[in-house]
């Protein structure tokens, strides 16, 4: 039986480029445990150039093959691609549109679902339309005096706010604001990351995460895990990935009642199905001291670094990551044929 030529595409043009490379390491190791796949790892650099792990310049062509700049090398036909790219152009839905155009099967959420979830404003509109509670917010479309005034009003009303670039991940372009004197500077910084900015009420709550994925044709939601940070901070980019991070993760959140856990899982599945997600996601919630559940955000290609929650929660649920990938890939290719 011939092997499946699988392109593992990683990197990308966002601030999460290096995190994508770390996630690709996990995918590469997991795929190597199966004899079904012939894997070619290709990095998409920040300038849009493709390069193999061996350092060969190349490109993905419309005929679904990797063609090398060195013409003495034989083009490599691609059967399937895993776009292990956090942020642009992976989680934004851009590269999925290209795969659709050239009819190349790929792992993960489709273009529209990726785009809807990546834009925090669009996502919150979807959450509300689906009847899933989420944090109070306003959104801004330009940096001007009116935006500063609106944000000042929100801060006065809510006491503490988060200002977030609408289209970034891993807490990039995200700022906690308690002092009105800092509003203008923070807004300017946030607009430097994205053309739209969302301002949310700060919620004093536990941060719970659920891995939601498709397994043997069923949508699975794990029990919630938890991100535990210093009480005076939030889960910043540095807290997530720094070697000296004080944050810790619990694969199973402690002291969460069965009733609350089931409600969180129900909301997670409702969001997954309602927003037409596919294959995998990590869905993040807040749980307040009064047991109020608020959907925070959806990650359509969750990290798979050594500290990432998605693969840990999947395995804790009793599923092997390599087997999971094999089921998804083979199921998709069989359906296509």
From Swiss-Prot:
Gene3D superfamilies: 3.40.50.20, ATP-grasp fold, A domain, ATP-grasp fold, B domain. One of its GO terms (cellular component) is cytosol. GO terms for biological process: cell wall organization; peptidoglycan biosynthetic process; regulation of cell shape. It is found in: Cytoplasm. It is an enzyme of class 6 (ligase). Transmembrane segments: none annotated. This is D-alanine--D-alanine ligase. The lineage of its organism: Bacteria, Pseudomonadati, Pseudomonadota, Gammaproteobacteria, Alteromonadales.
């Amino acid at each position: 039986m011939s092997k499946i030529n699988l392109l593992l595409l990683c990197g990308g043009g966002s601030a999460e480029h290096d995190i994508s490379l770390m996630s690709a390491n996990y995918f590469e190791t997991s795929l190597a445990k199966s004899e079904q796949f012939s894997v070619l790892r290709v990095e998409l650099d920040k300038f849009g150039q493709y390069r193999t792990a061996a350092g060969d310049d190349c490109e993905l062509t419309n005929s679904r093959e990797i063609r090398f700049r060195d013409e003495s090398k034989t083009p490599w036909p691609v059967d399937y691609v895993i776009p292990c790219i956090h942020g642009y152009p992976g989680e934004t839905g851009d590269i999925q549109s290209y795969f659709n155009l050239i009819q190349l099967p790929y792992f993960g959420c489709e273009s529209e679902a990726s785009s809807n979830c990546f834009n925090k404003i669009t996502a919150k509109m979807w959450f509300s339309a689906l009847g899933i509670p989420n944090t109070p917010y306003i959104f801004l479309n330009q940096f001007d005096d009116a935006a500063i005034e609106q944000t000042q009003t929100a801060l006065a009303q809510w006491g503490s706010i988060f200002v977030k670039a609408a289209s970034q991940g891993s807490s990039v372009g995200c700022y906690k604001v308690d002092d009105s004197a800092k509003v203008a500077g923070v807004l300017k910084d946030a607009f430097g990351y994205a053309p739209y900015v969302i301002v949310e009420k700060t919620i004093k709550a536990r941060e719970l995460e659920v891995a939601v994925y498709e397994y043997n044709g069923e949508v699975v939601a794990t029990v919630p895990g938890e991100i535990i940070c210093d009480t005076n901070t939030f889960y910043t980019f540095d807290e997530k990935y720094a070697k000296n991070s004080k944050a810790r993760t619990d694969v199973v959140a402690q002291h969460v009642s069965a009733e609350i856990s089931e409600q969180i899982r129900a909301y997670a599945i409702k969001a997954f199905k309602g927003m037409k997600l596919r294959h995998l996601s990590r869905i993040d919630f807040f749980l307040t001291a009064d047991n109020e559940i608020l959907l925070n955000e959806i990650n359509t290609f969750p990290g798979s670094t050594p500290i990432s929650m998605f693969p840990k929660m999947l395995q804790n649920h009793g599923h092997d990551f390599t087997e999971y990938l094999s089921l998804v890939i083979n199921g998709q290719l069989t359906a296509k044929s």
